[in-house]
Amino acid sequence: MIRKSATGVIVALAVIWGGGTWYTGTQIQPGVEKFIKDFNDAKKKGEHAYDMTLSYQNFDKGFFNSRFQMQMTFDNGAPDLNIKPGQKVVFDVDVEHGPLPITMLMHGNVIPALAAAKVNLVNNELTQPLFIAAKNKSPVEATLRFAFGGSFSTTLDVAPAEYGKFSFGEGQFTFNGDDSSLSNLDIEGKVEDIVLQFSPMNKVTAKSFTIDSLTRL
């Protein structure tokens, strides 16, 4: 009897998890489209430093995760950043559906979440110098977690890189917010082994650089 009851509970939990996973999966694409619309509406109001358009492509929805590309197009370029009109920054995005994203479960985290995502910078004409500086490794990778209540957390991993006379080791930054509007944003981070080489005999070094800040918007 106990064994049958336990089996019934397991089956019920599996059904609930499966239903929750399916439902949260249906919310990903509408959420992406709303984020893009809000961003582009802000552009029309002149709230961005550069004339940029956000879009997405190749959306592929599965049961446990959704994959797509997010791209930022500099419509008129950014001369001060040596960015030509039409050049793009592209990100590969892999979203694991809640309420219990697989990766979080594998790390022993059983707190329900709307979604968890991995974001990687794509190597293209505009971003290639960053990959070269990082010795052909991904220069930055982000892991994001979105809670049902609106709070979010992001971990940004930075690869060691060398940009001419300036170099640094690996780094990691975390961003935690109360809601999607970025209010009360808690930022912590650290970059190792910073070097600024003025000449073969003259350089400035720092073992690490640390940030610990609470931003209220």
Sequence positions of predicted segments:
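Glycine-rich, small/hydroxylated-residue low-complexity segments
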Residues: 7-8, 18-217
